[in-house]
Every structure is written in structure tokens, then in C-alpha cells.
């Protein structure tokens, strides 16, 4: 229907069009100077030292795990309440994903669940900054230091998120996403930030065929023709067309996230009169990026199942999302791990629903969602 309200819509405007035109007019549309500008901008945003732009956050996760030497027989701890790409990358490297439970009300992986899963085979910990809120990094990094295990932060939801006064990605290694529904987007893309120069060099090589140089050299205005392959790599570089859009979006980040926060505040106020339960906020000091606004739809409390609510909203022209169906309940993973049970993850996986939330959402759009929720709750 023409007036369908989507769950998400990218906030694009004249700035993004101008950025694309600049790249097209330059004659250099693949990986080039705009990538280097984007990497420098993310170092400034996060406060970290190095940044490597990639074609997607999934690509970033793949080469980050490879750069750590993750392989056959290794274990990587991550919550099941995440998008399956993380699990897929672990499995495709021959390693074993060790999925752990999350806090029932914040859906954050906890240090207690992580520590209980650590074995001599554990080679990495991947906490997820869920829905735009930060995980408890101090406690998680303390575990990593105590056991000598690297931490890779899944920051796909966390552009604009801060933890105890520091932007996510200020230390260690973190991976951000520029997918179409994220807080800033360039259709597809991602970036890895890190404080380790050797690790950054490995990422640059792995993302571009295993060459010993970056995909674009500032001095030569292209790739050095004498570049050699140091080890087999991938083609995960980001075109400058995408990087230019991401840069234009990044300049708007504060305004985009402020609008998201305002809509989230309205949702919280409206939920006081509705049976649907929003997620709780973490107790530690933070700034929430409000990538998602998630409610839990418990049939005993709401008189309707989550799936029925989503279907009913769709008939009213309102889109919703599911973030996420627990990874261990997906066909491949439930067959590989048939005895795995994660009670709080599973309870939420059956009940969570993401409501429309995007910067260009109008007051009329918001009122439409709340009116529909009242109508459904009153049936």
C-alpha cells in the first residue's frame, strides 16, 4: 500500500547526492581518498588510533577473526541474541561458536555468562552492543585480560553509543555497520577500529587480496603495481561511492540520533498505558544510540502473540522488525547444537518486536503506531 509505514527508512538528502556526484566527477569511484577520509573521521569519532573501512560489518568480522588466527578447534564466545553473520564467520573458519545467554531485560551478554563459558580453547570474546546500548565493557575487558583472550566488540548497532563517557570503539577492536537500516548508512559497508597497528595492517591486507599495501595509495593516486600478495586474502574493500555517502551521513550523526532519542522517549511514555514491555536500560553510565526500539509481547500479559501483533500491524500498514530470532534456534544451529538451551534468550526471541524508528518518522507516523497498538491491545 502506498501509505505503508516501514520499520526503518534511511535519512538521505541533498548532502548525500552531492557527495556521490563529487566522487563520480572525480573519475575515481572505487576505493580511494574518500575511504581514507572516512577512516580518519571514525578515528576522530571513537578516539581510537586506526580504522579500516570494509564492504560490510560481516566482512570486518571475518577478517578480524582471521587476523586473530581463529581456526579449526578454536572456540569463540558470543551471545545467541545476535545476527547470524557472526556465527557464520566463526563456523566458516572451522572454529566452534559458543553461544551464551543474555540478561533477560536488557538483552546484553553478561560477564558472568561469558566467564562460565571460557575454556582453554577460547580464542575470542564477541560482546554485542544491542539495539544502540552498550555492553558492560569494563567487566568484559577485565575478563579478557584475566584469561588472555582478545575481545572484538560487535558495534553494528552502536554508532553514536557511549559507555562511561567514551564512544564505543575507543579502545581495543570494534566493528561498525553501515547497512541500510543502521544509524548511518551507505547502503552496505562497515568499518573496523583498533588500537593495534599490526592488527590494522593485517586487516588491510586481508580485505584486499592479501596484498602488502592498502587498496589505494595516496602518493601514487592508485594501487602500486608492484604490490605482492603476502597471504591469500579477500575482496572486502569499500568503494568511494559508498564511503562518500557514509561521510555525509556521519556529519549528520548527532542530529539523526537526537531525533531517534526523541522518538524513543515518546515510545517509552506511551508504553505506560500499554501492556507491551520495552527493554530495560543498562545501569551503567551510557548514551544510547537508539538503533532499535524493541518491545516484548507476552501473550499472557498482552492477550496476543508477537507474531499475531506483527501481522495485525501489517494489515494496518505498519511495518515491524524482529531483532533477532536467536541464532541457536535457526535450522543449521539447532541441528548442530540440539541440546543447547538459553532460557532468557529464548523467552525474548519468541516475544521481541522492533517498532518503526527512523529519523524522518513524523509525529503523524508515531501517532499512527500508538493508535494501532491501543486498538490491538483493546481487542
From Swiss-Prot:
Catalytic activity: UDP-4-amino-4-deoxy-beta-L-arabinose + 2-oxoglutarate = UDP-beta-L-threo-pentopyranos-4-ulose + L-glutamate
A GO CC term assigned to this protein in UniProt: membrane
Superkingdom, natural source: Bacteria
UniProt KW keywords: Aminotransferase, Antibiotic resistance, Lipid A biosynthesis, Lipid biosynthesis, Lipid metabolism, Lipopolysaccharide biosynthesis, Pyridoxal phosphate, Transferase
Any one GO MF annotation of this record: pyridoxal phosphate binding
Cofactor annotation: pyridoxal 5'-phosphate
Function, in words: Catalyzes the conversion of UDP-4-keto-arabinose (UDP-Ara4O) to UDP-4-amino-4-deoxy-L-arabinose (UDP-L-Ara4N). The modified arabinose is attached to lipid A and is required for resistance to polymyxin and cationic antimicrobial peptides.
Family: Belongs to the DegT/DnrJ/EryC1 family. ArnB subfamily.
PANTHER family, per the entry: TRANSAMINASE, UDP-4-AMINO-4-DEOXY-L-ARABINOSE--OXOGLUTARATE AMINOTRANSFERASE
Protein name per Swiss-Prot or TrEMBL: UDP-4-amino-4-deoxy-L-arabinose--oxoglutarate aminotransferase
Organism annotation: Salmonella choleraesuis (strain SC-B67)
Recorded name of the encoding gene: arnB
